[in-house]
C-alpha cells in the first residue's frame, strides 16, 4: 500500500519527472460557452512567450474546460495550440484536470504532446510531457513543462 504524502512516496513522484523543458508566461482571455449537462463551460485563448527545449518561442492556444459535478475542471486543447520559433513551428494537444482558485483564476495539471518538423524543437517530438498551467484572477498565465520519465 502506498500512502500519499509520505516522504518516500514524494521522492518517487519527483523521480518520475524528467528534465524541465519549457517555461512560458503570458496572458489569457476567457469566453463562457453554453453549459454542458447543467455545468458551466469555458473557452480560453492564451498568448505566451518563453523557452521550449532551450529555444525562444511564442505560443498561441485555445482550449476549453468544463466544470465537473464535484466542482473540478476538465480541460482540453485538441491540437489547437501552436509554438513558433525562428526555424519553424510545433503544434500541440493537451488535456488536464484543474480547479478554480480563490482569486478567480485557475490551475491545471496534465499531459501535453508536441508535433514538429522544426529542427530546434525535435527534442519534444514523440514524448509525453507533463505540465502545470496556472492563471491568476487577472488572466496572467504561467506554463511549466517537464519530460515524463
Annotated model-derived regions:
Residues 2-149:
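Beta-strand-enriched cores of mature, soluble protein domains
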Amino acid at each position: 500500500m502506498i500512502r500519499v504524502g509520505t516522504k518516500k512516496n514524494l521522492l518517487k513522484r519527483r523521480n518520475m519527472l524528467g528534465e524541465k523543458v519549457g517555461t512560458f508566461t503570458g496572458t489569457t482571455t476567457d469566453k463562457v460557452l453554453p453549459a454542458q449537462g447543467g455545468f458551466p463551460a469555458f473557452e480560453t485563448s492564451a498568448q505566451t512567450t518563453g523557452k521550449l527545449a532551450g529555444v525562444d518561442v511564442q505560443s498561441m492556444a485555445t482550449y476549453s474546460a468544463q466544470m465537473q459535478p464535484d466542482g473540478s475542471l476538465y480541460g482540453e486543447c485538441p491540437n489547437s495550440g501552436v509554438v513558433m520559433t525562428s526555424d519553424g513551428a510545433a503544434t500541440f494537444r493537451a488535456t488536464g484536470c484543474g480547479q478554480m482558485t480563490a482569486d478567480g483564476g485557475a490551475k491545471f495539471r496534465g499531459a501535453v504532446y508536441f508535433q514538429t518538423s522544426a529542427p530546434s524543437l525535435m527534442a519534444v517530438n514523440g514524448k509525453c510531457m507533463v505540465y502545470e498551467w496556472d492563471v491568476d484572477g487577472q488572466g496572467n498565465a504561467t506554463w511549466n513543462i517537464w519530460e515524463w520519465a
